[in-house]
């Protein structure tokens, strides 16, 4: 009996997940945090917020960025986290379907995996998912354009184009479908015209959410359709996020558009560059997803896993990664415009005035 107790205690200590007062006690449990890239502002903020809040909660943190969306780098980094003794993995995948093999090792070592913001597909190693309500993000964007164009009562037609994100990012489909759940009836009725003819997700996708790729595609659309201040009128662009919206802005400014004739343009993430574009009249709105809130939620989930207590989730039906429904916690997105950006971004301490000052 004594031998069994000694072995049990040794196993518990070996996990590094012994807690007193809610904080790691035995040498600080190490949490692996894998982010996709540092080339987009939002992932720098996500990583920094995650690291700061996990460390404040008493954990050691191994934070890694996978170059510029380099899948082999991310796989190698996750392998190193597993070998290096991380007790929980928090992963924002570059490609939601590219981590199946490496996560078999995580499961074999009983390491829980939290998919962060992007759902990891086709892996039964995924324990939980933490994100924002991604379908609702698209709904908010669609509702914004519907209301600003007065689609319910205006005669129209209105010319609109669509641009969304990376095909490997499971969220991109939710954003796109959320927006179309509002806009498609008007497209079908002819009140909204997509003159490029590019209406499907595949036609509107942007590899790696790249600003440069978005700009190239939109320059081609402008040229082929004849959009311009003195050409065919463009009323609105539904862009799923800020990096693609910035590509659209670059293309339209290059075509001669100014604040005076700029079409409605949506976005997401409240990147500094896009907030500045809002102030310049070159973007209409963005979705604010406070990464501090998401990071705090992940810390709660990690701590619950470590304590063996119930992990907080609020969705057990929406997100199926191909192996089953993944228990999820979805934070609420809100939209930012010139009317409320100060309250959301400045007063909350997310940015300073200097961060988004327009020169």
Report each predicted region and the residues it spans.
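Positively charged n-region of N-terminal signal peptides that target proteins for export
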Residues: 1-10
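A residue-level marker of the well-folded mature domains of exported/periplasmic proteins
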Residues: 3, 21-359
């Amino acid at each position: 009996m004594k031998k069994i107790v000694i072995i049990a205690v040794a196993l518990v200590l070996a996990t590094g997940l012994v807690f007193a007062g809610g904080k790691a006690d035995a040498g600080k449990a190490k949490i692996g945090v894998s982010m996709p890239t540092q080339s987009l502002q939002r992932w720098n903020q996500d990583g920094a917020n995650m690291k700061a809040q996990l460390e404040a909660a008493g954990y050691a943190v191994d934070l890694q960025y996978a170059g510029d969306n380099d899948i082999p780098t991310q796989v190698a980094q996750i392998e190193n986290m597993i070998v290096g003794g991380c007790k929980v993995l928090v992963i924002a995948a570059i490609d939601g379907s590219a981590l199946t093999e490496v996560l078999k090792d995580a499961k074999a070592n009983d390491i829980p995996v939290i998919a962060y913001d992007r759902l990891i597909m086709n892996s039964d190693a995924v324990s939980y998912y933490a994100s924002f309500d991604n379908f609702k993000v698209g709904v908010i964007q669609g509702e914004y354009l519907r209301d600003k164009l007065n689609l319910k009562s205006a005669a129209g037609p209105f010319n609109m184009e669509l641009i969304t994100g990376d095909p490997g990012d499971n969220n991109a489909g939710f954003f796109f479908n959320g927006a179309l759940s509002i806009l498609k009836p008007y497209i079908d009725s002819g009140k909204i015209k997509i003159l490029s003819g590019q209406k499907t997700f595949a036609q509107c996708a942007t590899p790696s959410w790249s600003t440069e790729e978005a700009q190239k595609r939109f320059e081609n659309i402008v040229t082929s359709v004849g959009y311009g201040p003195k050409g065919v009128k463009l009323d609105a662009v539904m862009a799923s996020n800020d990096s693609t919206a910035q590509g659209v802005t670059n293309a339209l400014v290059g075509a001669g558009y100014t604040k005076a004739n700029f079409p409605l343009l949506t976005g997401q993430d409240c990147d500094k560059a896009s907030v500045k574009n809002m102030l310049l009249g070159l973007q209409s709105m963005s979705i604010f997803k406070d990464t501090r809130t998401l990071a705090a939620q992940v810390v709660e989930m990690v701590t619950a896993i470590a304590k063996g207590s119930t992990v907080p989730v609020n969705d057990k039906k929406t997100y199926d990664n191909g192996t089953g429904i993944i228990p999820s916690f979805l934070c609420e997105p809100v939209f930012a415009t010139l009317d409320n950006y100060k309250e959301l971004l400045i007063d909350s301490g997310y940015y300073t005035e200097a961060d988004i000052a327009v020169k």
